[in-house]
Swiss-Prot record:
SUPFAM superfamilies: Flagellar transcriptional activator FlhD (SSF63592). Belongs to the FlhD family. Gene3D superfamilies: Flagellar transcriptional activator FlhD (1.10.4000.10). Keywords: Activator, Bacterial flagellum biogenesis, Cytoplasm, Disulfide bond, DNA-binding, Transcription, Transcription regulation. This is Flagellar transcriptional regulator FlhD.
Length: 107
């Protein structure tokens, strides 16, 4: 394996572990709000909360990113990047657009 590939995989694992640890912490602090912010179903949130540190590390070792870029809708991405509405109104609009997205389920 090339050094660049190895470095990229190490970076993916690091991002995955950081994401999983952050998600667990968020869920512990405010379960309902975190499910909304993360786009998790109740089942996914429950599974993630029950994972041990060793299981988190194993899951993070995937060669694929575990987090997903949720801003794949042009109107949502535009709402977050263009200062058309300004400040709080723009943030509220983005939150409404995010709330319309379906919750992710395990396939």
């Amino acid at each position: 394996m090339k050094t660049a590939d190895s470095s990229l995989l190490a970076d993916i694992r690091e991002v995955n572990l950081s994401y999983l640890l952050l998600a667990q912490r968020m869920l512990r602090d405010d379960y309902a709000a975190s499910m909304f912010r993360l786009g998790f179903s109740n089942e996914v949130a429950d599974i993630l909360m029950r994972l041990s540190p060793a299981q988190l590390v194993k899951l993070a070792s995937s060669s694929s990113l575990l987090c997903r870029f949720r801003f794949d809708d042009y109107s949502l991405l535009s709402a977050l990047t263009q200062d058309v509405l300004g400040g709080a109104l723009q943030q509220a609009h983005a939150t409404i657009l995010l709330a319309r997205q379906p919750v992710e389920e395990l396939a």
